[in-house]
Amino acid sequence: MPGLYCPTSWTPLPLTDSCVRAYAKGPCLSLRARLTYHNPQPQPVEGVFVYPLAEAEVVSGFEAEAAGRRVSFQLHSRRRSQAACCRALGPGLGTSTPRRCAQGHLVLNLAQARSTLVLPTGLVAAAGTMTVTLCSSRELPSRPDGVMHVALPTVFTPLAQPNLPGSPRSPGLCDDSPTSCFGVGSPEEERPTWEQPTATPDVFSGPARCPAPYTFSFEMLVTGPCLLAGLESPSHALRADALPHASSAATIRVTLAEGHQCDRALEILLHPSEPHQPHLMLETGSLSSAEYEAQVRARHDFQRLQQRDSGGERQVWFLQRRFHKDILLNPVLVLNFCPDLSSKPGHLNAATRELLFLLDGSGAGHKDAIVLAVKSLPAQTLVNLAIFGTLVQPLFPESRPCSDDTVQLICESIETLQTVNGPPDMLAVLDWALGQPQHRAYPRQMFLITAASPTAATTHQALEFMRWHRGAARCFSFALAPACRQLLHDLSVLSRGQAYFLRPGERLQPKLVQALRKALEPALSDISVDWFVPDAVEALLTPREIPALYPGDQLLGYCSLFRVDGFRSHALGGQEPGWQSLAGSVFPSPEEVLSATSPGTEPTHTTEPLGTGTVSAELSSPWAVGDSEQSMEALTDPVMDPGPNPSSDTAIWRRIFQSSYIREQYVLTHCSASPEPGPGSTCSSESPGSQGPGSPSGSRPLDPPSQQGCRSLAWVEPAGSRSCPLPVPPPSPFKVGAMSAEVLGRRQRAALAGRSLSSPSGRANPVPGRARHPSLDAIPDGLGPEPGQQLGQGLDDSGNLLSPAPLDWDMLMEPSFLFKPVPSSAESAPPAECLPPQAPRCHVVIRALCGEQPMCWEVGVGLEELWGPGDGSQPESLPMREAAWDQALHRLTAASVVQDNEQLALRGRAETRAEQGRVRRSWLRAIQTSKVSSAPSCFTCPVAVDATTREVLPGALQVWSSDPAELSGMSASQDQLAAAPLSTAVHSKGHQGGCSAGAWDLDLNDNSKSALGEPISPTGDHHGLPHQPPASSRLSLGRHRRLCSSNKGQTHENSNDGSNHDYLPLVRLQEAPGSFRLDEPFCAAVCIPQERLCRASPFAAHRASLSPTSASSPWAFLSPGIGQGDSATASCSQSPSSGSEGPGQVDSGRGSDTEASEGMERQDSSDLRGRTWATAVALAWLEHRCAAAFGEWELTASKADCWLRAQHLPDGLDLTALKAAARGLFLLLRHWDQNLQLHLLCYSPSNV
């Protein structure tokens, strides 16, 4: 219930007027609100304004004015005295109002400080008013269909008690609906009932309320990279108009068509015309590039650096250290992408996930639910199980493929699970789960089942730990007790999962299956974003981690552009500027080798004989980079101006030169944003774009200086063919003697063939000269096709995911795109054709995996607004900037940079204490970026200042927040975790002397103990699929043992459920692919004699396998006890193959090998008949006997149905006839149960 409060009694002051202006620019929303409050009390009161912060929202402006005095705020670094004051009060979770310390300060816990802005506003006169003006920027959430949801904070539209009797709402603009042209019903019928607020309101949560109606005005401008297809509101009637004097419908003005009734919050749905296409948006900075360069050159520290070293690379390095501070001054590009992840039939069976089941030791009574969940998993998933109490006891060292052996081991372990006493360590189990190695194309899903009652300190630590690793996994939590609901709810919100709460006596199975269905929904994982920008630009990329995308999620990437060509050393006379080596790629070519020198030394030139090197090596140019710790300490002052020195080993992302085109105006620079750090990488943020003087001598490239900031550049995949797919102007004349004719010929052929000068690392081009699309030539390792194969089929299936108009290679033969041959030194060059230079552009390539299928999207945007439309130079004056909306894209970029540095600082503090320098630099960058851009940070706190003098108000109420302190229990939890595997039979290799008194007290034979006791040795590859354990005797669980143990514990579990859900014995028999076997355990699970199943089978081989006596007498089926004894429940007398061969088979004379292979084929065909018939019967049995529990076995049935659809049925039978025969079986069984004669029925299995 946010709003303006009197802190002495925490009573809200009523709102009298609310005026809101909004600006929706693509996925970003800017808000400017003016709120007027009235003090009804006869004495002055102190005001405290409470504003709810959305995720990644930035409040860039705040001003409270009363009686001519204006109060604003600034972000200051947190002081050590705040931590001591907050620790004295404890975490304070669940409090509804801010607490007060002994000094009278308002104290918030870290969760409250992250989600709420609490600011003192000064005194409000008796019967006076206070006007609060607020400016903020936030990201708009999206829905799975790409619709963006605009919801105003309830502090702008508080719920007020309606005037009774109320006048009826006038009809809207449309005849069918007053709210939109999309047919949404009138909100008049959905008006919520007024509820009187409680005596002590919760200022941190809940909708805001007002005791009386107020006036409200609203206006919103909507623009974006694509046109708006429509808009609607489920709450209000809207009016949409074009702007006055507008020449197009690119910007829409939205207002309210009817008066605001103060009974609901305002919501608007925006329908873009291209909801599932990537888009780029450009927002200019507060300074032009010329103004920014002049401002930097006027700095005293830059002038001192210029006096010591006038080199251009040193000046560029100076700029790189300031990137995070100058975000608001330079232009920003924003990438927005909401992929279409609508589910397709059969996607559940093809889903690739890693599922970790984290079971509280006190939840041993829910064994059936775990068994059902594991049996419902597709065969392509990875699975692991961990029991946690005071110790974390995983079943496997790392996740294993969901094979029959793995599922059997999990089920047998669950059967012997005993209740574990002791308080569960939530922090330790989260540390174990999130610390497991990641597997490529397998997004992680955690299922946390617990009845724990965590303390406030544990809850605080667990939530902060999940916030540090929020993109690593989704958490689906199940609260078995009410004490842990708040913790599990917050964990699910942070990880984009979902929380489920069980009432007493409620079954866990339906909720667990519902969560499994959501966990297996389509997803994009292993996302990498490649930015191609002009060589004159350096880029700061954020966020540093890109999590997997699920339906409704959108990818937002920010790129802050810094034009640095005015600071670089230009090429010497006689050298063509295009010869400068490109340092904008983090992907090495196969022939490029690192070599580092100390600062101040000359680069090492490594030449090769002509013809032995590649074009990339011959067109590269080196420049010196050091690698000395002493130089870092001497040249870097992390306190005054933090940032890694170019020679810093601990702060450098290794960046490799990449050859590119020889262009007249600029060379494209490659920057990559990916969630996967590469080998030898530590942490950095920007794409390199610096370059040194060119050299045609074919020298090896060296390490360029790293750049500070909050964006990691990753070694995702080789990018030998990653030049920007843009039309290339003809090269300008240059000195021909620098290159031989052979080199020039190879350069021309390479440019015409593949638009790149090097192959992907580790392999050569399969066919030299073959045209390759730039979005297809660099596929993630291990996932792309073999050399010579293409991804056309997979990308066509994804719905034309490439750019709408990719560059056709046939265009290169047209005059405007033709690379003209360069004459040799003996020939005279013809006069170059004067063509207008190409305008600079930025190009972005998004690569991801949907399951195991590579996907790719491309989008580009022109940078004419920054360079001007003409010759590529800076225009004299930039277009009019939208200063009224306070640079929303810039603010969100800065907020993402702050979040990146917070994670680096806090993770480094939690993982190790050795790299204090790197942690301190990240900490300082977060503080500096937060102060400059007003982006919130856990290292800063808002302080009330005078809006005119910008000085801190003396005597003003101070709001402090708790410190994001180190997890005090982390080290102890890690020690317990490390000791847990050694104390259990699961991980103690070769432990044969009995199990410890832990959760895994398994009562198995020697084979199963050996299978569990052999841990998987850790591998260095954390992105590949874990190796399947070798097939040996210790992993060979016999078929007889598997079948006999399938019904173990059945009676006990059914009695625990207290209901008649008897599908679990059948589910236990399902194999990992989804099939069932026609054998005795299956017949016992469905309670149908095997002879009856064979008689009703649509396969003739099954009916022929019956004994002649039983086949000749219908009474043998109607009354098994008459004349047959127990023969009806016996197995078929002969196997299908032997029944068809007969007893008198002789040698065919065709050889033993031929007969053996034919016999194997007959056996496989017979097994397929039995499995398909048993699977169809299992599906029909579930539909007829367990229809009430459909929500529990639907995933199992879906897996079985997908397996059936993938089979090629023998004997010419189709799937429809097979399922019809299975359904007819239960009709026949009903007549059999009624003891009717078989010849009276109009049914024959052969006619189905």
From Swiss-Prot:
Residues 184-204, 590-650, 672-710, 751-789, 1008-1037, 1126-1168 are annotated as: Disordered. Pfam families: VIT_2, VWA_3. This is von Willebrand factor A domain-containing protein 5B2. It comes from the Eukaryota. Residues 1-138 form the VIT domain. It comes from Mus musculus (Mouse). Residues 595-619 have a biased composition (Polar residues). Residues 1159-1168 have a biased composition (Basic and acidic residues). Residues 684-701, 751-764, 780-789, 1127-1145 have a biased composition (Low complexity). Residues 354-527 form the VWFA domain. InterPro entries: VIT, VWA_domain-containing, VWF_A, vWFA_dom_sf. Transmembrane segments: none annotated. SUPFAM superfamilies: vWA-like (SSF53300).
